[in-house]
From Swiss-Prot:
Family, as annotated: Belongs to the endoribonuclease YbeY family.
GO biological process, one term: rRNA processing
GO cellular component labels: cytoplasm
Class in the EC hierarchy, top level: hydrolase
Gene that produces this protein: ybeY
Protein's job: Single strand-specific metallo-endoribonuclease involved in late-stage 70S ribosome quality control and in maturation of the 3' terminus of the 16S rRNA.
Protein name as it appears in the record: Endoribonuclease YbeY
Lineage: Bacteria, Bacillati, Bacillota, Bacilli, Bacillales
Amino acid sequence: MSLLIDFIDETEEVKDEYISLIRGLVEKAAQMENIEEGAELSVTFVDNERIREINRDYRDKDQPTDVISFAMEEMGEGEMEIVGAEMPRMLGDLIISIPRAKEQAEEYGHSFDRELGFLALHGFLHLLGYDHMTEEDEKEMFGRQKEILEAFGLGR
């Protein structure tokens, strides 16, 4: 199984091991979710100020957050479905705040690797259509997160 993942580091703080961790975890999730070969996504690493701007501009929340997902397959109001040639499946974009991930790892008392992996997986599942707006959806999404993290070796 192989996804095409474009990593963009706006912080200049991201080590190769972080990219390897996220690539491996997202590949494992894609395998467990039966995502086809060649599907694409991007992962951008930003600081708290940048994610606050994105959160404000796209979600009307003027505060930093840990991860934001932009699913390409989610149809917005008034958007037309694109039907065309055999193109790779574009899942969407993940934006992860590195400083927020560090803060939360400390706050929750676990490693930065686990927090970064959790955030990447959480965002990835949103790209696949999972959500936690209702209690039932939350139970399904968080249960799936736990299964994948444990299968990858990042369980609690």
